[in-house]
Amino acid sequence: MLVPKRVKHRREFRGKMRGEAKGGKEVSFGEYGLQATTSHWITNRQIEAARIAMTRYMKRGGKVWIKIFPHKSYTAKAIGVRMGSGKGAPEGWVAPVKRGKVMFEIAGVSEEVAREAFRLASHKLPVKSKFVKREAE
């Protein structure tokens, strides 16, 4: 599972998810990509579930690049605890993904296999997404 090795601050502000992604909108490493069309937080468990779904379908063929990393911590108070008395304990890690960001890339497989692998992976993610190809240079 993806987690940062060390962080400066354990608890972070939630922040805002306005606008489009600044970078990472094109397929840069592989031939095909899965691009987010909505913005959302994606947890490290969701990233791992999507990766497993893709690699199992491809049967060890091709290469997968994960272009997002869960560097932001999120907190939660225990169930039944009243409001107040500080921020909750760190619960997990998320990758804030804005619309337009290419989250995963694949190379070394046919387009049909890549489409199906991304379709299976997209069911594991909380964002709407679309299949994109690398643009000819």
Curated annotation (Swiss-Prot):
Keywords: Ribonucleoprotein, Ribosomal protein, RNA-binding, rRNA-binding, tRNA-binding. Coiled coil: none annotated. GO terms for biological process: translation. Signal peptide: none annotated. Gene3D superfamilies: Ribosomal protein L10e/L16 (3.90.1170.10). GO terms for cellular component: cytosolic large ribosomal subunit. HAMAP family: Ribosomal_uL16. This is Large ribosomal subunit protein uL16. It comes from Streptococcus thermophilus (strain ATCC BAA-250 / LMG 18311). The gene is rplP.
